[in-house]
Amino acid sequence: MWRVCARRARSAVPRDGFRARWAALKEGPGAPCGSPRIGPAAVRCGSGIPRYGVRSLCGWSSGSGTVPRNRLLRQLLGSPSRRSYSLPPHQKVPLPSLSPTMQAGTIARWEKKEGEKISEGDLIAEVETDKATVGFESLEECYMAKILVPEGTRDVPVGSIICITVEKPQDIEAFKNYTLDLAAAAAPQAAPAAAPAPAAAPAAPSASAPGSSYPTHMQIVLPALSPTMTMGTVQRWEKKVGEKLSEGDLLAEIETDKATIGFEVQEEGYLAKILVPEGTRDVPLGAPLCIIVEKQEDIAAFADYRPTEVTSLKPQAAPPAPPPVAAVPPTPQPVAPTPSAAPAGPKGRVFVSPLAKKLAAEKGIDLTQVKGTGPEGRIIKKDIDSFVPSKAAPAAAAAMAPPGPRVAPAPAGVFTDIPISNIRRVIAQRLMQSKQTIPHYYLSVDVNMGEVLLVRKELNKMLEGKGKISVNDFIIKASALACLKVPEANSSWMDTVIRQNHVVDVSVAVSTPAGLITPIVFNAHIKGLETIASDVVSLASKAREGKLQPHEFQGGTFTISNLGMFGIKNFSAIINPPQACILAIGASEDKLIPADNEKGFDVASVMSVTLSCDHRVVDGAVGAQWLAEFKKYLEKPITMLL
């Protein structure tokens, strides 16, 4: 129903290097019922089929009286989640939506075989989507028990179960002859009886069953507008309730984790109800945004339409001012009893859900001190939220000492709490990931820029009135050519392989009011300086205005960050994963250098650059070789023509 505003976008996901993390559906005795993500909406296993999420993917509602024609929709509506009590605990891995427009995919290659151990972060398979071939990796340790979709299978619907994984190697044998039909036959027969609702508990149609008594309508949900997007902010609605919508009209502007993207209409209709008001932050993927109807007379029927899923979504209020400081001395807080440690599996492994593991890492919690309340003692999100660290013994003695002088909190009005935007949050997450997982090392060199400045001056005279070529344009061109000479620097770490790219797409760091973003100069190795200059000016302008489209900043094979214009002599930049290198450019300054003349010296404009390398991909000697090629191209710019 919806698409990103740029119709000419080549791709909504990175062309290389993007990995999708799989969401698995826990099954078996005592297994928790998770929420696998299928497209932009989450399927809640506990309630069978969601009341709005999957239907809204096709613009279909139960109140319309129509039958869903979409193949994936029929499959999901006809095959509610069941538990296989005759089998050991296991995980059904569905095919997720790896791009906003993906409906089916092709299993290009399985990277793991049946019986093999899968570690956290291991690549399981490569899936060909409607945009690119995307790596598919594991979030936790397990074993491959059964592959249900063989290599080369085409048009696998999103949401189809593609493999089975187990936690224990001894459980693999139980799935030797496993098929989805066999699992369905083993399901308890009493489960379907839970479908009819009790007559004694009627619910308002607007709350529990939106769409059950309404005219034909389309419920629009928030889709994934970037590969890493998990939620978004509704910045502005461009249409009001009751207004007519024509094909191509801009409906709203959504702030994702990357940029602010226009959200436009593909079909004519009328906006009947806005479910998420302007300014609402952290709207999860799949949440209903609005209701659209085909007939104007149907608008009034949705005046009180309120699905329960969005009742908690409200515009974020400003942070409250600190309360006044009380003169009453603080009362001692009781010390919570030390929780027993979580049960450890083989070799001391602690069983923990991926979400709980992530939250524990963010809060600095030692998982061995947390008591798990999930199935078989597994640590879940609730355990992390309720965890209270144990107090050390000396703390009790310290409490007996007279209280020291208290530091008064800062009075109200002396600070400002700035809400964290989605872009800033993602920048923080990716930079932290880079520093924690990539072994950085740094190489620096000085480059004589005298020849480049002379050539630039002559070229700008020739281009007078048509634009100007900057020193940074020479740097982009020289970097791209050096990547062709030393392709190891134009590579990506893919966990199981090192992907060496055959084209050079240079990401250029641009500072914007919303945060740092890296628009891409595609095929920089074959573009001339004039074209590169034009691309950079256009991309930088769109970045600062927040008008970049996803394909203009997602991907890239090599990054350049230039702080020379701010007078910074040299610095070390953080690698942009999955790339292997980033080049930090400092300011040029005049220095005395030896020269074969009467004075014995000369004054040269020297620029300092630092190359940050991923040591898993680029060894020190290779990084030095790249810098030598880069320096040669800039000190003798005529060699760029060779």
UniProtKB/Swiss-Prot annotation:
Its main location: mitochondrion. GO terms for cellular component: acetyltransferase complex; mitochondrial matrix; mitochondrion; myelin sheath; pyruvate dehydrogenase complex. Residues 80-99, 313-346 are annotated as: Disordered. The modification Phosphoserine is found at S99. Keywords: Acetylation, Acyltransferase, Carbohydrate metabolism, Glucose metabolism, Lipoyl, Mitochondrion, Phosphoprotein, Repeat, Transferase, Transit peptide, Tricarboxylic acid cycle. It catalyses: N(6)-[(R)-dihydrolipoyl]-L-lysyl-[protein] + acetyl-CoA = N(6)-[(R)-S(8)-acetyldihydrolipoyl]-L-lysyl-[protein] + CoA. Delipoylated at Lys-131 and Lys-258 by SIRT4, delipoylation decreases the PHD complex activity. Belongs to the 2-oxoacid dehydrogenase family. Part of the pyruvate dehydrogenase complex (PDHc) that is a multi-enzyme complex composed of multiple copies of three enzymes, pyruvate dehydrogenase (subunits PDH1A and PDHB, E1 component), dihydrolipoamide acetyltransferase (DLAT, E2 component), and dihydrolipoamide dehydrogenase (DLD, E3 component) to which is added an additional protein the E3-binding protein (PDHX, E3BP). In terms of structural architecture, the E2 and E3BP components assemble into a 60meric central core with icosahedral symmetry. The central core is decorated with E1 and E3 proteins. This is Dihydrolipoyllysine-residue acetyltransferase component of pyruvate dehydrogenase complex, mitochondrial. It comes from Mus musculus. The gene is Dlat.
